[in-house]
Amino acid sequence: MGYIPYVIENTERGERSYDIYSRLLKDRIVLLSGEINDSVASSIVAQLLFLEAEDPEKDIGLYINSPGGVITSGLSIYDTMNFIRPDVSTICIGQAASMGAFLLSCGAKGKRFSLPHSRIMIHQPLGGAQGQASDIEIISNEILRLKGLMNSILAQNSGQSLEQIAKDTDRDFYMSAKEAKEYGLIDKVLQKNVK
């Protein structure tokens, strides 16, 4: 992630400098940006757990701008979103593709949003295998299991039938924010921040 901006606030004790991510965290905003891998997922999970410990009743905003990434890493974020007590509101800024779109759809019902020019894309899991035939079969079975799991969760989150999800995720399926709302992945397209 290159350059990280800092913000300066005046307090009773003088000026205080925060990196922008720490300052956002203070307002219960978590930013998921870039490819989802184990390192990124661990950081997101830690922030969600920290915010729950700070206030288990207050919503958390998860802002997503991601092309997707590793399925198991994304599922660790998904499980944590469901494990913690606060509602997690999801907001797509830019793009939510693959695992990014999956997590976008997993926000608390009624609290899944997108900015108007964002792009959302769902598809089936990607993977590859090499080695002995028995190893390839094991990996293939695991990918198919994950495909079934993710399709089932997407169907539950969107209100689409499992058959429709399977058909639509067979290839890359791109949507505008408006189309994602009609599909059921989000609840509202935001024009202005009302805070």
Swiss-Prot record:
Residues making up the signal peptide according to the UniProt record: none
InterPro entries: ClpP, ClpP/crotonase-like_dom_sf, ClpP/TepA, ClpP_His_AS, ClpP_Ser_AS
Role according to the record: Cleaves peptides in various proteins in a process that requires ATP hydrolysis. Has a chymotrypsin-like activity. Plays a major role in the degradation of misfolded proteins.
Family of this protein: Belongs to the peptidase S14 family.
Catalysed reaction equations from the record: Hydrolysis of proteins to small peptides in the presence of ATP and magnesium. alpha-casein is the usual test substrate. In the absence of ATP, only oligopeptides shorter than five residues are hydrolyzed (such as succinyl-Leu-Tyr-|-NHMec, and Leu-Tyr-Leu-|-Tyr-Trp, in which cleavage of the -Tyr-|-Leu- and -Tyr-|-Trp bonds also occurs)
The keyword Hydrolase belongs to this UniProt entry's keyword annotation: yes
Enzyme class at the top of the EC tree: hydrolase
Keyword Transport: no
Active site: 98 (nucleophile), 123
Pfam families: CLP_protease (PF00574)
Protein name, as recorded: ATP-dependent Clp protease proteolytic subunit
GO terms of biological process kind: protein quality control for misfolded or incompletely synthesized proteins
A Gene Ontology molecular function term of the record: serine-type endopeptidase activity
The enzyme's E.C. designation: 3.4.21.92
Keywords: Cytoplasm, Hydrolase, Protease, Serine protease
Main localisation: cytoplasm
Subcellular localization(s) per the UniProt record: Cytoplasm
A Gene Ontology term for the protein's cellular component: endopeptidase Clp complex
Subunit structure: Fourteen ClpP subunits assemble into 2 heptameric rings which stack back to back to give a disk-like structure with a central cavity, resembling the structure of eukaryotic proteasomes.
